[in-house]
């Protein structure tokens, strides 16, 4: 079997101008980045913004193994299959972060015969969005430090600056740094740190903004620090929201590429799902909905993180609500949740599949709490056995959830036909009746408690002293009516990554909150979630290279 990059490089790409004709996008609607990549113009976005939206399909997953369960691959394969059965379909995905690409992932543009192309470009610098976000974030840091250096008219307490610098790499050495050293000419010394770019609030803002004016307003509302009297300092106080918007004026436009089968793909934005809301941009999803009859999109990690945030944070900003949710499951992940060691996941173990089904079952029940029908997609692997597949199908039948085996990695669109037909049946039955888990009027404590007890299956929430103090402070500032974005491990329903399956009776501990008032949500930190990842012992970068003719090697 060819590697992902070998498959990608064997495909004869069509000019992007030709690919997008099928959804009504013309040459003059594009800002080209070579032959195969483009940004969609605001003229076209505005032209279709009042059109009736099509059907929306959200792809999510069970709590994953470290390798992931193939949401992007399944999303791409499903979109290709929907097109193959005659449904005009677009896909809306997140952009990969270079840090994980060079670290553990090696690439994030799908896999096998379900990829978006050109995958080398998408995984590396693409159209420069990540660089623009990094630059805007760090320009804010520089302007903030300069304000303090030039007299600090706002009375900013340097001990209470909460804005960090970013870089789009995994670099643990930058988590905690000291800036301003070297004497008076080099600024005021203070503690600082770096996050990875996709953890930046500016990434979240870019993905929730509906136009340039909304982007500017959200940037103005970012809290960067506190004064000596403990009142918040916003970007608007520094009067720099215009400059930041200028840096992002092109990055806000969605990117257009294609799948192996020529499905138009909007790939735009990529906030982390365990520390941010984990969804591609509202602009990309909304525009796809108005251009196509079916739009397939995804939300990061398991349904307890990405899907909950998609439904509680992103959906209220969309022109329609999901008509179906596809939950990707693998037999290896179910066996892991059933107690099998990671080294033994390729061995047949029907009982472990049955034991691990509790994890998938809870995700199905959770999606139904939002009033949306679920479909289970079994992402097929070579090591899967007929007995294991039969057991999983039987268990799905018992809870009355449609289930289909999909082999899109190996067989592309053909491997997703059964799944596509089932999804269409569910969507056209029109049983979706979306409702949020909580209302804006609920307090932050009430919102978190609902997520913990109704989605995670936990017993209660413990707020540490710092978090309790912040709750009082945030209520005074009027931030308590914002949605909650939970930051926790993706591997478990709990805040303990080793508590697998569908645990009950546990407590979730909130150690502190991070206000993301520009993005419009409050992040609740649990456990030891890192905003700057480190590299593994053998990073994927060690296998990467480029040939004399410029061909990329080692991306996967």
Curated annotation (Swiss-Prot):
Mind telling me which Pfam families this protein's record contains?
FTHFS
Q: Which UniProt keywords apply?
A: ATP-binding, Ligase, Nucleotide-binding, One-carbon metabolism
Q: Which SUPFAM superfamilies match?
A: P-loop containing nucleoside triphosphate hydrolases (SSF52540)
Q: Name one GO biological process term.
A: tetrahydrofolate interconversion
Reported EC number(s) for this entry are 6.3.4.3
Checking CDD domains in the record gives: FTHFS
Does the entry feature the keyword Kinase, yes or no?
A: no
InterPro entries per the record? Answer: Formate_THF_ligase (IPR000559), Formate_THF_ligase_CS (IPR020628), P-loop_NTPase (IPR027417)
Say which family it is in: Belongs to the formate--tetrahydrofolate ligase family.
What name is this protein filed under?
Answer: Formate--tetrahydrofolate ligase
Species assigned in the record: Streptococcus thermophilus (strain ATCC BAA-491 / LMD-9)
